[in-house]
Swiss-Prot record:
Record organism: Pinus thunbergii (Japanese black pine)
Binding annotation for heme: 35, 55, 58-59
Protein name: Cytochrome f
GO molecular function: electron transfer activity; heme binding; iron ion binding
Spans traversing the lipid bilayer: 287-304
GO biological process, one term: photosynthesis
Function per UniProt: Component of the cytochrome b6-f complex, which mediates electron transfer between photosystem II (PSII) and photosystem I (PSI), cyclic electron flow around PSI, and state transitions.
Length: 319
């Protein structure tokens, strides 16, 4: 009897573990397709040697993105880097379950070495209000200059404000008073490719063979099974279309290999941009201010001297 109870307990535990594993897999798949988590998992550096940001591997459509930073900053100061990801707020994308929903956005900000996310105690109330409830994180624990955010609701955060702390060359010997490049990548909407290379339901599906569409079966949970009578070998090919894309073909139609079976439901896309920022030497700024002050004083003295000379000339003429 005891052995039987032990067996039943082990059986229940096995089922529970199986359910938890399945939940983990489903959740992981959903998250990994959400920019920019996938890039963190699959790439040591999000920017390739060619300058291309790897997020474009999953988000195939090209869309604009913009970044605004100050022209120059002083050492050890907090400033804003504003990333703008514009899109039509009325658009609804295809979700993983095939239904329509709002678009999310995400971004990766690649700063020069030494620049990093500002600690909470250094962020002013004004900047804190602009950042809202956003949760920023480093791309890697050892890469504090690369910051990622998302996915977050695009209707609320199409403009992302990153609070950035500039380095101090007096304490950081790797930092220098120079002009530096800043790179940004930003997307709106879901990707078209999953981490394992398979397609998401947010892309176009094409025929895998040439032939006649003999059957289109609408699946109970959405999506289609399309049977194609292959003209090359006389066999049949079944193409699976997940929920989301809309069919463009019908039964009895002759189609060719790679011909689109569905529309392309993707409304989002990825873009990248860059900007430049100067880490300004405070002594140079003070020197410039002193120079400007000396020029202004020289102009004032020149005007006074000129007026004094005119008075002397006028007095001599009266004599």
């Amino acid at each position: 009897m005891q052995n039987r109870n032990t067996y039943e307990w082990a059986k229940k535990m096995t089922r529970l573990i199986s359910v938890l594993v399945m939940i983990h897999i489903i959740t992981r798949t959903s998250i990994s397709n959400a920019y920019p988590i996938f890039a963190q998992q699959g790439y040591e550096n999000p920017r390739e040697a060619t300058g291309r940001i790897v997020c474009a591997n999953c988000h195939l459509a090209k869309k604009p993105v913009d970044i605004e930073v100050p022209q120059s900053v002083l050492p050890n100061t907090v400033f804003e880097a504003v990333v703008k990801i514009p899109y039509d707020m009325q658009m609804k994308q295809v979700l993983a379950n095939g239904k329509k929903g709002a678009l999310n956005v995400g971004a990766v900000l690649i700063l020069p070495e030494g620049f990093e996310l500002a600690p909470p105690d250094r962020i002013s109330p004004e900047i804190r209000q602009k950042t809202g409830n956003l949760y920023f994180q480093n791309y890697r624990p050892n890469k504090k200059n690369i910051i990622v955010i998302g996915p977050v609701p695009g209707q609320k955060y199409s403009e992302l404000v990153f609070p950035i702390l500039s380095p101090d060359p007096s304490t950081d010997k790797e930092a220098h008073f120079l002009k530096y490049p800043i790179y940004v990548g930003g997307n709106r909407g879901r990707g078209q490719i999953y981490p394992d290379g398979s397609k998401s339901n947010n892309t176009v599906y094409s025929a895998s063979a040439t032939g006649r569409v003999s059957k289109i079966l609408r699946k109970e949970k959405g999506g289609y099974e399309i049977t194609i009578d292959n003209t090359s070998d006389g066999g049949q090919v079944v193409d699976i279309v997940p929920p989301g894309p809309e069919l463009l073909i019908s039964e009895g139609e002759l189609i060719k290999v790679d011909q689109p079976l569905t529309n392309n439901p993707n409304l989002g896309g990825f873009g990248q941009g860059d900007a430049e920022i100067v880490l300004q030497d405070p002594l140079r700024v003070k020197g410039l201010l002193l120079f400007l002050a000396s020029v202004i004083l020289a102009q004032i003295f020149l005007v006074l001297k000129k007026k004094q000379f005119e008075k002397v000339q006028l007095a001599e003429m009266n004599l």
